[in-house]
Design a protein with these regions (language model features):
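Short S/T/G/P-rich N-terminal loop/turn motif that feeds into the first structured element of a domain
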Residues: 1-53, 60-70, 93-100
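C-terminal structural segments of small proteins and small subunits
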Residues: 66-70, 74-90
């Protein structure tokens, strides 16, 4: 089974922090063979108060998804992500088919 991050967040409020997160994320994502699929269309909100965007990140395994999140290099990147927007990140195991 594959591992996933599901990131649900409000619209980006700090573009500079988001750009720094993206810069730091690239080598980390490559290290863990992550593939992301940011939604270009806002999700249809049916049972929540606020959700501006959804990103699905696919990993080869649940262990890889957890290890990536726990990687010290991601700690630095995460600071910028949390500065850029208010978000929720869930880690789960499954098979969603083609994510990218």
């Amino acid at each position: 089974m594959k591992g996933y991050w599901l990131i649900v967040g409000t619209e980006i409020s700090d573009q500079e922090a988001q750009a720094e997160y993206a810069r730091l994320w690239k080598p980390i994502g490559e290290k863990y063979q992550a593939r992301s699929n940011p939604s270009k269309v806002p999700p249809l909100l049916v049972e929540a108060r606020d959700s501006g965007r959804v990103v699905v990140v696919e990993f080869p395994s649940l262990e890889a998804a957890k290890a990536c999140y726990d990687d010290p290099a991601y700690e630095e990147a995460k600071r910028f992500a949390l500065q850029a927007s208010n978000r929720v990140l869930l880690i789960f195991e499954g098979d969603l088919g083609e994510a990218g």
